[in-house]
């Protein structure tokens, strides 16, 4: 997977791209990240990338010319998506990440800044994506989240592939509570069922905890899951857990 990140602040990505699973994935060439600064494509001596909006208004907008030039300088792979990070876009979720991994080999990610971008930039864009219903100073942090979410789904990034399918949101529910040693910490004890060695009972407990936690914290997800779940999914999961 190739990522081309169009950003006025490429240095923001340095530590993120060199650490953790993301850094390892890049080192193993599972993914490639190319940082492109639209300021490098300006033609005036001040390297101006923003200007006042027509009709008046607060703040400055990113000009279209440097963004177009930056994107048009990039190679075009056969399966390419051009994404604008925007609060008006589709919210990042696990189905979106899986779709991007399955369908594309190149993601061009444009990070807006100031009060946004000239609307004509949308002629370049095939999709707008948002981190959530709130405003940030720029698209860099949402872009980092998008890259991280996509890369960890690429084959070879996570050593144990079952770790991916057992996480929150992958089955439509939040994850169950998890514990490690010690079994008793300041009076808070690990549930007995997890110490029992009974895999079927553990699987059932985890399933029940997923339902409870999702109901308590994200009832909207539980409602969606109840509408979409397939008959037999729990029983199949229980059998798989019991066979391990």
Curated annotation (Swiss-Prot):
It is found in: Cytoplasm. Residues 211-244 are annotated as: Disordered. InterPro entries: Alpha/beta_knot_MTases, tRNA_m1G_MeTrfase_C_sf, tRNA_m1G_MeTrfase_TrmD, tRNA_m1G_MTases_N, tRNA_MeTrfase_TRMD/TRM10. It catalyses: guanosine(37) in tRNA + S-adenosyl-L-methionine = N(1)-methylguanosine(37) in tRNA + S-adenosyl-L-homocysteine + H(+). GO terms for molecular function: tRNA (guanine(37)-N1)-methyltransferase activity. Its EC number is 2.1.1.228. It is an enzyme of class 2 (transferase). Keywords: Cytoplasm, Methyltransferase, S-adenosyl-L-methionine, Transferase, tRNA processing. It comes from the Bacteria. Disulfide bonds: none annotated. Pfam families: tRNA_m1G_MT. S-adenosyl-L-methionine binds at residues 112, 131-136. One of its GO terms (biological process) is tRNA N1-guanine methylation. GO terms for cellular component: cytosol. Belongs to the RNA methyltransferase TrmD family. Specifically methylates guanosine-37 in various tRNAs. Homodimer. HAMAP family: TrmD. This is tRNA (guanine-N(1)-)-methyltransferase.
